């Protein structure tokens, strides 16, 4: 208490007078307000709380989060799922337009603000639905002895009777008929083509027969075309999709395994976004920078006919193959004990013909956007997204996610209407069109709004579809790993069996099923491609979390992937049989992440972890890559020197990140003292948001993929589903090994320097002064 003079004391002897009582009341109110402020903790929101309450804002945050989770209902998810999967809805069709407006209607009814669509004019591909694709085998006399139907049969009429639903096709495959000998090339990756050549089998002028799995189908076809193939056939091996046997008791609809005439559909485009408008949005009023012929010439689109076949049709090919037996790791289970052969060609002079009927068309697609505007920082976006177009009905991919996202929106708005909670930052709901053709809707959106996103977007959280019922599975960048883990600890376990074993949260099962044993945490990978998070991270530098539920399996995805048997029956009776409890848990996790990013005072981004991962993981991997380069001692020293400089910059990042942690803690303290002065918070958050942007190279890191601009995490050139750590460096090493030259050697050093420059950018971003 400040010193009070004697005269003042004498003048204030009447302590019960009116003016003095008012003064004491004011002081007491101010003191109680201070206690309320001190209780604010690390969260802020638009909630109008009682400043005299003894309940802390952290308690209120947990209560609000639980309320949102409790408001997410399985019955609503089931309702939305049936609405969105009534008929086949391929991108660019009237049926998919109906789904877009059904989503907009659901979001509007829930109470989202400014729900609208964003159209783009893009190049899509369709089959001739009146003339199915086919595989034909003729004997040496030219007589037809086998012809595939090209159509999968209806198994559950109530859900699968849409016209043309069973058509078997692959988008962007070349139109035409080719006859040639067939060659088996396993999974169709780079090593498979290399090993086939070493075994003396030439692909040129042949039809390539390849198994799905362990890579993007478009990359398989791209490599086959590069090797000289004139056609390609893709099939799902029973070792992947029918592991318990192919009799009726062990496949759909009795189980989740693929039935004998099921096929995987998909896109063959080698790249993301509209193939005719790289770098720029495909708007009706804008010029297309590339022609169809140019897209085919540079490998973006295939020019050879390609079709998918069932394992039943594949057996007709495999049992006729001539040539030597395949290596043991190329052997599958089609035909039981059948030994796969390499070819080329069939025994007994039989011939193979494939007929593919396809057409390229420019069509209008439309994304759906809706908002919950933030009360404190409306210009900061927490973005949630899923695509809604499907190859057929899409009850798993993607509309399990579409239904869950609609319910998250509804539950959040219910919470807003029934409590005083409102997110501090804006939550943006996004439904993407034409993802299946090559992430087109999301890529065009990012290309159109990249400048806005780089200024306003905090994070993009993607959930494509539910792939299984065993465990949560998360891909994210190092700065967000901790928050992905922490959120899972707050979501109840959807499995009765898991709860009976003492694993009460989603995190507990995740740690059990997908452990990173050395790190003592669940396994988390860096995001690759294959879904709508990719353009946000790789093109715009917006940090992402991509998650789903899946089973522990060596196969890439679930057996019925992209088949016509993805209808609600599969979700409800085969995959998520406890009243869609897994779907609900996915929604709860999505909402928990969104609310955390929306309401944390200081954004939950950890640059210290990024620096640690760089030093402990990324740099050792890079060192191993450059150590294998066949160069002279002098040239290697030049590479080693630049690597050492990158290592030094990474150490600088670690030091600066730890120092910045102190700044973040000070900001927490300052906000708790005075929540009405947000200048410290804004300064810290601005720098945190900017760190991921440092890794965007405007010139790109891939000659083949215009959307690959992230120098750490861009999608692999060899597999569009996988990330490629420091892709620019890896591409430069590959170029040098293919064609050794001083120029290519210098490019390796240049690419290492480019990564170093990005690391230095992060260091400078975190500094208080330049």
UniProtKB/Swiss-Prot annotation:
Protein's cellular compartments: Membrane
Co-factor: note: Binds 2 Zn(2+) ions per subunit.
GO biological process, alphabetically ordered: proteolysis
Residue sites binding Zn(2+) 2 per the record: 397, 436, 562
Cytoplasmic-side segments: 1-19
Enzyme's top EC category: hydrolase
Membrane topology recorded in Swiss-Prot or TrEMBL: Single-pass type II membrane protein
Active site, per annotation: 435
Binding positions for Zn(2+) 1 per the UniProt entry: 387, 397, 464
Cofactor(s) in the UniProt record: Zn(2+)
One Gene Ontology term of the molecular function aspect: carboxypeptidase activity
EC code(s) of this entry: 3.4.17.21
Cystine crosslinks: none
Spans through the membrane: 20-40
Alphabetized CDD domains for the sequence: M28_PSMA_like, PA_GCPII_like
Alphabetical list of SUPFAM superfamilies matching this protein: PA domain, Transferrin receptor-like dimerisation domain, Zn-dependent exopeptidases
Sugar attachment sites: 175, 337, 417, 469, 551, 606, 630
Extracellular side: 41-770
PANTHER family, alphabetized: GLUTAMATE CARBOXYPEPTIDASE 2 HOMOLOG (PTHR10404:SF77), N-ACETYLATED-ALPHA-LINKED ACIDIC DIPEPTIDASE (PTHR10404)
Record family assignment: Belongs to the peptidase M28 family. M28B subfamily.
Name listed for the protein in its UniProt record: Glutamate carboxypeptidase 2 homolog
Organism: Caenorhabditis briggsae
């Amino acid at each position: 208490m400040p010193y009070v003079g004697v005269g003042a004391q004498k003048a204030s002897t009447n302590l019960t007078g009116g003016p003095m009582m008012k003064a004491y009341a004011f002081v007491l109110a101010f003191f109680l307000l201070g206690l309320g402020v001190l209780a604010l903790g690390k969260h802020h929101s638009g909630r109008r709380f009682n400043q005299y309450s003894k309940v802390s804002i952290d308690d209120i945050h947990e209560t609000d989060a639980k309320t949102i989770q409790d408001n997410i209902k399985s019955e609503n998810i089931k309702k939305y799922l049936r609405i969105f999967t009534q008929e086949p809805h391929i991108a660019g069709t009237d049926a998919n337009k109906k789904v877009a407006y059904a989503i907009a209607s659901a979001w509007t009814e829930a109470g989202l603000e400014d729900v609208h669509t964003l159209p783009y004019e893009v190049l899509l591909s369709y089959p001739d639905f009146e003339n199915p694709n086919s595989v034909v085998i003729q004997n040496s006399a030219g007589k037809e002895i086998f012809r595939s139907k090209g159509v999968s049969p209806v198994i559950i009429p109530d859900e699968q009777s849409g016209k043309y639903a069973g058509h078997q096709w692959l988008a962007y495959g070349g139109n035409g008929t080719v006859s040639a000998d067939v060659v088996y090339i396993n999974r169709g990756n780079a090593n498979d083509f290399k090993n086939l050549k070493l075994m003396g089998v030439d692909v040129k002028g042949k039809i390539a027969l390849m198994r799905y799995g362990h890579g993007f189908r478009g990359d398989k076809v791209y490599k086959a075309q590069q090797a000289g193939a004139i056609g390609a056939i893709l099939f799902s091996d029973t070792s992947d999709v029918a592991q318990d046997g192919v009799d009726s008791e062990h496949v759909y609809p009795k189980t989740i395994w693929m039935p004998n005439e099921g096929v995987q559909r998909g896109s063959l485009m080698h790249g993301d976004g509209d193939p005719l408008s790289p770098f720029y949005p495909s708007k009706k009023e804008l010029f297309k920078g590339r022609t169809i012929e140019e897209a085919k010439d540079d490998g973006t689109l295939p020019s050879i006919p390609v079709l998918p076949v069932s394992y039943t049709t594949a057996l007709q090919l495999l049992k006729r193959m001539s040539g030597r037996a395949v290596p043991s790791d190329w052997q599958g289970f089609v035909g039981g004990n059948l030994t796969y052969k390499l070819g080329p060609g069939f025994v007994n002079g039989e011939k193979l013909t494939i007929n593919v009927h396809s057409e390229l068309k420019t069509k209008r697609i439309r994304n759906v956007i809706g908002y919950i505007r933030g009360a404190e920082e409306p210009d900061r976006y927490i973005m949630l997204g899923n695509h809604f177009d499907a190859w057929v009905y899409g009850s798993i991919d993607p509309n399990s996610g579409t239904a869950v996202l609609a319910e998250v929106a509804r539950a959040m708005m219910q919470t807003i209407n029934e409590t005083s909670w409102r997110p501090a930052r804006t939550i943006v709901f996004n439904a993407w069109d034409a993802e299946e053709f090559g992430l087109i809707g999301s890529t065009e959106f990012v290309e159109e709004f990249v400048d806005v996103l780089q200024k306003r977007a905090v994070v993009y959280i993607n959930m494509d579809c539910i792939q299984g019922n065993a465990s949560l599975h998360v891909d994210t960048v190092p700065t967000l790993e901790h928050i992905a883990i922490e959120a899972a600890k707050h979501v109840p376990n959807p499995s009765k069996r898991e709860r009976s074993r003492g694993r009460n949260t989603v995190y507990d099962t995740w740690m059990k099923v997908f452990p990173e044993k050395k790190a003592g945490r669940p396994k988390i990978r860096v995001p690759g491609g294959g879904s709508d998070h990719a353009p946000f991270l790789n093109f715009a530098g917006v940090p992402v979390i991509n998650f789903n539920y899946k089973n522990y399996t060596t196969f890439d995805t679930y057996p019925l992937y992209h088949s016509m048997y993805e209808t609600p029956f599969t979700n409800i009776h085969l995959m998520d049989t406890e009243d869609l409890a897994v779907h609900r848990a996915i929604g709860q996790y999505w909402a928990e992440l969104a609310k955390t990013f929306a309401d944390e005072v200081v954004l939950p981004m950890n640059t210290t972890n990024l620096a640690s991962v760089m030093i402990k993981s990324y740099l050792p991997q890079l060192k191993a890559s450059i150590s294998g380069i066949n160069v002279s001692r002098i040239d290697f020293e030049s590479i080693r020197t630049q690597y050492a400089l990158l290592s030094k910059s990474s150490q600088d990042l670690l030091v600066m990140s730890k120092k910045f942690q102190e700044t973040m803690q000070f900001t927490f303290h300052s906000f708790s003292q005075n929540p009405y002065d947000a200048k410290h918070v804004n300064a810290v958050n601005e720098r945190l948001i900017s760190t991921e942007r440092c890794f965007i190279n405007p010139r790109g890191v891939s000659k083949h993929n215009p959307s690959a601009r992230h120098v750490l995490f861009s999608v692999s050139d060899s597999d569009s589903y996988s990330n490629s750590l420091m892709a620019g460096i890896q591409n430069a090493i590959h170029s040098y090994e293919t064609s050794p030259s001083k120029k290519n050697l210098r490019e390796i050093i240049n690419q290492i320097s480019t990564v170093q420059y990005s690391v230095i950018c992060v260091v400078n971003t975190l500094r208080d002064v330049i």
